Amino acid sequence: MTKVTNWLSYSPRASVHEPAVLQIFDQIGEDWFGGSGISAKAFSDALQSVGPGPLVVEINSPGGNVWDGLAIYNMLRGRQAPVTTRVVGIAASIASIIALAGDSIEMAEASLFMIHDPSGMVAGTSDDMRKMANALDQHAEILAGIYTKRTGKTSAQIRAAMT
């Protein structure tokens, strides 16, 4: 395997029929303090490195930034070639959304999948707090829509599981 960064390694395909492998083994979104984690931009660069063709994405991530995660989900859903997502550890929070991007979704026997309502922090005025609450509600609806579409569960079942 070729190492790209601390969070991602990839294996080039031996033939056009064999999948390339990307491993997401860190938080989603870059850490503001230490620079660890995977941004949507870095993931896009990695996708370009492996090129078109079948892809396996192995996931062991606690989740992280919703915006980066949704962009990664959309990039994977937009691929022309088949994508298999494989949870090999934990797919928590926004990493669970990325796991649902696969055309085929696999979970290892000793793996975990965790969903919840989005959360965030804000400092400021009461108007700032209301804006944040509205943004969180909007994100919750987007996430619930993906869970509903990709799992076949009802919206009510998904919303209950997220709270």
Located regions from the model:
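N-terminal organellar transit peptides
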Residues: 1-96, 101-163
